[in-house]
Amino acid sequence: MTRDHNSRRNHFFGRLCKGGLLLALAPLFMASCAGDGFDDGERFISDVSNSTLSSPDANNVTCTASADGKSQTITWKVVRGAGGYLFSFYDMANLDEPIVKDSLIDGCSVTVKREEDMNYRIELRTKGNSELNNQDATETTQVTVSTFTPTYATIPAGSDLNEWFAANPIPDTAVDEMLNYDLEGGAEYTLSDVLDFDAKRVTLRTNNKTNHAKIVYTTATSGITTTAQMNIKYLDFDCSGMTNATGVFAFSKSTTVAAANTIDASKYKWSGAYIPDPISIVNCNFDNVKGYFFWDNQVKTWADNVLVDNCVVRLAPEASIGGGVFWTNKAGQINNLTVNACTFYEDPDWAFDYKYFYQAGMAKAPDLYVDNTSYSAAATNSVNYTNSTFYHVTWNNGQWGNYNGMQSKTYSYWIMTDCIFYDCSTSGSVPRRFLHGRTNQPGAKFNNNTYMNADGTFQDPGNYDTSGTIIEEDPQFANPAQGDFTISGPTQVARKTGDPRWLP
């Protein structure tokens, strides 16, 4: 059964954006026109009087992002004789709930918060000036602004992605530059075979981050593979067609490897492909995941960073799986894995399970250097779980982690903070298996985690999580059988633990 997590996600996102923008605007209404070549006198003493004013010309409205991309300054040319401007600001995906509505700006610029991958609408209407007997403008100027990186191609709704990319091959320029492929918001697509991005840098995304396109995996060979930087954003996946022997995502089996993705054999022992730039899976929902979420595909590829952020993943294996949800034990490796603000779960009565959540068998970081006495301090590896919810995963005598090449290493970092685990890692506690049974790991950090068993008791953290911050309290999930993990446990709510989308 496919579950829709969008409404909950949108509600949460909307609150954050709206609050942030309103707070950002409050101290900025006093901006002046001086930066546009007009002094204060020109705003209020003008040769324009006894007139109905016009709103600012849309061609003279500019929007400039800050250096860090977190804010944007909107400016417009002064309308002589004006008494101010009514400013409104919208998320184009949610026009019924303005971010800012009819705020009076006494000036010609305003700075607001900027979110990545958004389509905004700016509205400006000139206010009259009673001292000059000038009347309000009757029309409103509208300007749209996009913070999406430029689109390379839009794939028509209803397409089979394998057929479309076969007819429209990714150009060789994508070896050196990221190309953005957009799917249409609310549309459905199919994936009937392996979609191999090979050594090309690709972003696959919906052009509306709050109205996801859906990709349906229709066959046992459906999946997305890569040997390069890859971004998957704002998409829903129905993985019904896949099997327990395949992965939603995997390293590519292609023999094509970009020159930038090879490793200097004189420096490194690693002889396979290397992906120095991140693989990111952001703001996506996954249903009916029957096999690995990410695996090495039995290919010797080293990914420096894999990030899964703001995702919901419903696992539905059709048989017991000896591998992991993240599985890199056959040839490849992930140097740094981060799972943030995510939910991974199986239904409460699901009959099959995974042996591991994350299993990695390869050597790590400095062990891969020919001369490992002179490696850079940056040559570290890490496993990071932050603000996430895990429910009924590795419940059948499973283990949270198993790593043969990185335990007891001074350059390994283990971060597990603000997470909720329910009925997970029943063969040894979550913190024990997370640290591969090694106590006193110098790079380990725990904080505000819950480790609850299915019978209502709590796991013994032993000498693994010694933070003193463990929350032994039922998080009181609203309705796990329907994929609703909203919490009402007082301590978890107070400390804002687990996946943030489930905070009340």
Task: Indicate where each model-derived feature is located.
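Beta-strand-rich modules
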Residues: 111-134
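Extracellular beta-strand-rich solenoid/capping regions of secreted or surface-exposed proteins
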Residues: 190-203, 214-273, 299
